[in-house]
Amino acid sequence: MSVHRSKSSWAQAYLIHKRHRKSGLSSPLYQRILYGISIAVIVLILSGCTTIQGAVDDSPSFEEGGKLRITATTGMIADAAREVGGEHVTVTGLMGPGVDPHMYKASQGDIRKLDDADLVLYNGLHLEGSMTKIMEKMSKSRHVVAVAENIDPTQLRYSEDGATEYDPHIWFDVSLWMNVTQTIEAALIEADPAHEADYRQNATQYLAALNTLHQEVQTKIASIPESGRVLITAHDAFGYYGDAYNIEVKGLQGISTAAEYGSKDVSDLRNELVERGIKAVFVESSVPSRSMEAIIAGARSMGHTVQIGGELFSDAMGEAGTEEGTYIGMVRHNTDTIVEALK
């Protein structure tokens, strides 16, 4: 029974009642009989509509073709979801190249994309700033997963600026991103168990590629002389990278770009550059470069030349279709840029 037919039944019942009234069949006995019949018809109509509505609510809300619709906050998460999901998923990323997730505010369009998804993936650990409350609210009624949720807290770095409890930039340690990949794998299987075998196979292949990348980064960073193995960026996003690959990391701002910095922070970092003879600093694709330019100018005024070693991708990946537009390509680009500037 369709909703249209239900509405027609309502109309037919009304017309029958009206016709009989015109025919003079309006005795109390007749009215009681007609009332009983009307109630029975209404119950049948409502029960039919309820059954239909229940069937719609309980069925998978996949798009035509049976693909699982996934909305992910960051490009890194979206890329991992595509790798694991393969041909069975359609992935929409909210934050594109150059977007700072710490300062990001969801638009009405973003809310629609989240609402239309069968599965929502976000980083967690307060990376997404004000969007965190939206995710927590949606998780009460939808399939929403924080991909960092299964990482052992002992492997997480504490936030030194007090903005969050933990440093959310987990993707800079490839071994932690392997954990995230497994969480995404489990989320896809739960949402779409019919394709479990394919999700497991895709995840196994991607995890093997990530393991190779992890070893590659270790080898390349080790080629930098230890005295010059210092990575200086606009904000402290590379802490996990430093811990995992044995390179000292310093950022002008704290873990979140929402953290403010002052003239003393600039002068302190400038003085350290000069005293240690550090020859390169790095700008980030998602953070304005003026802070690094101020430090370079300050060092130059003290007779020390510091170069911009290149642009690193920190909180967002590169353009779609480029090597840096994938997680593996982004990590490889960052590593090669760092090694070339500091070696």
Question: Where are the language model's segments positioned?
Answer:
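Bacterial N-terminal signal peptides that target proteins for export
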Residues: 6-10, 14-37
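N-terminal acidic, proline/glycine-rich, low-complexity intrinsically disordered segments
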Residues: 1-5
